Curated annotation (Swiss-Prot):
Protein family membership: Belongs to the LeuD family. LeuD type 2 subfamily.
Pathway membership: Amino-acid biosynthesis; L-leucine biosynthesis; L-leucine from 3-methyl-2-oxobutanoate: step 2/4
GO biological process, one term: L-leucine biosynthetic process
Classification of source organism: Bacteria, Bacillati, Bacillota, Clostridia, Halanaerobiales
EC number: 4.2.1.33
Pfam families cross-referenced by the UniProt entry: Aconitase_C
Gene name for this UniProt entry: leuD
Protein name: 3-isopropylmalate dehydratase small subunit
Subunit structure: Heterodimer of LeuC and LeuD.
Length: 165
């Protein structure tokens, strides 16, 4: 799975409360979640994010309370992938379960800047910055996790398996 987009960059410890504030948890409407995604940390996020953009962040992305709304808001906003130095484990699992591609990459914030064009090969764990001639290696997901993401999430993967059974 290959993705390409411009970078929206954030620091360490971006928690689920700023990804989608608790005041919007009374809905699971993807469009509504997208409108309020990241608004407490980046009030202009909804107006500047473009389909295919990639979030790059520091350590412990998605920490805080467990809520599937957080990766759903990011995915619904049009973000194609989140690359972070590390993820909170519950966000990591929720992202995979809803089909949001994520990639862990040590020191990625030292090499990628806001607005950079990034190409990601999830199958190989490769990150390329073609305008800067930079290539970064990370650890790819195991194949079964890649299949879940490619299917659009765990539920879609299970539905697909039932159809072929």
């Amino acid at each position: 799975m290959k993705l390409k987009g411009r970078v929206l960059k954030y620091g360490d410890n971006v928690d689920t409360d700023v990804i989608i504030p608790a005041r919007y948890l009374n809905t699971s409407n993807p469009d509504e979640l997208a409108r309020h995604c990241m608004e407490d940390i980046d009030p202009d996020f909804a107006s500047k994010v473009k389909d295919g953009d990639i979030i790059v962040a520091g350590k412990n992305f998605g920490s805080g309370s467990s809520r599937e709304h957080a990766p759903l808001a990011i995915k619904s906003a049009g973000v194609s992938c989140v690359i972070a130095e590390s993820f909170a484990r519950i966000f990591y699992r929720n992202a995979i379960n809803i089909g949001l591609p994520i990639l862990e990459c040590k020191d990625v914030t030292d090499r990628i800047e806001e607005g950079d064009l990034v190409e990601v090969d999830l199958n190989e764990g490769k990150i390329k910055l073609p305008e800067k001639n930079i290539n970064i290696d990370s650890t790819p997901f195991p194949s079964f996790m890649q299949e879940i993401i490619k299917a659009g999430g765990l539920i879609e993967k299970i539905k697909g398996g039932i159809k072929h059974a």
